[in-house]
Structure formats: C-alpha cells, structure tokens
C-alpha cells in the first residue's frame, strides 16, 4: 500500500476554511489599526491584536473558534465606526 502524500497533521477542509477566516480577520484588523492617527494608540492596538490572536492560537473547538471570529468581527466593526467618527 502506498504512503499518503499528505503530512499526518493535514487540516480538514473545514479547519482550512476556518483558518482562512481567522487570517482574513487578522489582516482586516491590522489594516484598520493602520488608520489610527496616534502612534502610541496604534502600537497599543497592534500589540493587543497580536497578543489576542497568539493567546487563542491553540483553540481547537469548532464552536469556540466560531464565537471568537464573531467577537473579532464585532470588535473590528466597532473600531471602524470609532475611526469614522474620529475622522469626520
């Protein structure tokens, strides 16, 4: 029998799609943070985002990951609203 070409820890399709959602959210948050006018606030928010994603990196429960993505999207929308108000 031939050995599988996939590494033993290959992601399932569902895990791969979730991972893509998380990475997209992370990139969107970092892009939004770039628009923060204050250097110190921008640095604080970048560090906060990085630490939050690192802290939750080991999460494997599907429901937990989905909940964190939802919370992240809500926080992103709040940040975007705050930036829009600050710029108007």
Curated annotation (Swiss-Prot):
CDD domains: Complex1_LYR_LYRM2
Localization in the cell: Mitochondrion
Record's keyword annotation contains Transit peptide: yes
Superkingdom: Eukaryota
Keyword terms: Mitochondrion, Transit peptide
GO cellular component: mitochondrion
Listed Pfam families: Complex1_LYR
Transit peptide, residue positions per record: 1-19
Biological process per Gene Ontology, one example term: mitochondrial respiratory chain complex I assembly
Predominant location category: mitochondrion
Protein task: Involved in efficient integration of the N-module into mitochondrial respiratory chain complex I.
Family as reported in the entry's similarity comment: Belongs to the complex I LYR family.
Protein's name in the database: LYR motif-containing protein 2
